[in-house]
A protein has these predicted regions:
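Bacterial N-terminal signal peptides
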Residues: 5-17
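Extracellular/periplasmic carbohydrate-active domains that bind, remodel
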Residues: 18-255
Length: 255
């Protein structure tokens, strides 16, 4: 019979190591999502996202299929994982995007909430390889701003990686008042801005392929007296190894 001291067991444990537990997973289909591109899956998505946040965080899984949704909101420690051949498509109905105060061209004003939105949360993001499609039909005289596809506001540790975004009636992505933002290996296609970094700090944009009709990447920090009053600069931004095509305005702009 062999005996092991506590010190020996601890040493062996340190050498072998223990695998970290996988993140909790919440499949949108388990919450009623259909994924046929016709029936709206907004409620199912929001239930999955809320359950993930309440459980302390994890991943919300979007399996293959085409999911028609209105605006949904991500919570704390929640990653939306778009699996292979998964497509999220924004609804064409403006009523599926609640009205709220939004940041637009450097000022706060009433507007429609983004397709995928987050506010005042930590450790949130979206990872691929799926696709998110905005809906240009939402942009109309009664909604001149259109609907941004991805818009976290006042969030910390935001991660977007490895998926495709096609624009709808507005900018593709608009992180606002966020800290520690990582945007990596995104493909963005559309006729408006690709990435608008608005009064954010510690932002890394790398290995992205952006082809837009307007600015590919734009750095913003407010406008006029309102921008001076709020006093939130965009700072410490690293952009590297990106392919940028701006067909009408700038590939990289600061305004």
């Amino acid at each position: 019979m062999k005996f092991f001291t506590l010190a020996t067991i601890v040493a062996l444990s340190a050498q072998i190591g223990f695998a970290a537990a996988p993140p909790a997973a919440f499949n949108v289909r388990d919450f009623g999502a259909v994924g046929d591109g016709t029936n709206k899956d907004t409620v199912a998505f929001q239930k999955a996202l809320d359950s993930c946040a309440v459980a302390g965080g994890g991943e919300v899984l979007v399996p293959a299929g085409k999911y028609l949704i209105g605006s949904v909101q991500l919570g704390n420690r929640t990653i939306l994982r778009l699996e292979t051949n998964s497509v999220i498509t924004g609804s064409a109905d403006a009523n599926d995007y609640p009205m709220m105060d939004i940041r637009w061209e450097g000022r706060w004003q009433p507007g429609r909430r983004a397709l995928i939105y987050a506010a005042n949360v930590d450790h949130t993001g979206i990872v691929g390889p799926g696709r998110i499609e905005g809906n240009p039909a939402v942009a109309a005289p009664q909604n001149p701003r259109g609907v941004v596809v991805l818009e976290p506001i006042s969030c910390n540790d935001v991660r977007w990686e490895g998926f495709t975004v096609t624009q709808g009636g507005n900018w593709a992505t608009h992180p606002t008042y966020c800290t520690d933002v990582t945007i990596k290996n995104l493909k963005i296609i559309g006729n408006r801005d690709g990435i608008d970094v608005d009064s954010c700090k510690n932002v890394r944009i790398e290995k992205c392929d952006i082809n837009t009709g307007d600015d590919s990447i734009s750095l913003k920090s407010g406008r006029g007296l309102d921008g001076a009053r709020i006093g939130k600069p965009t700072e410490n931004v690293l952009i590297e190894n990106c392919n940028l095509v701006g067909r009408r305005f700038a590939c990289l702009a600061a305004c």
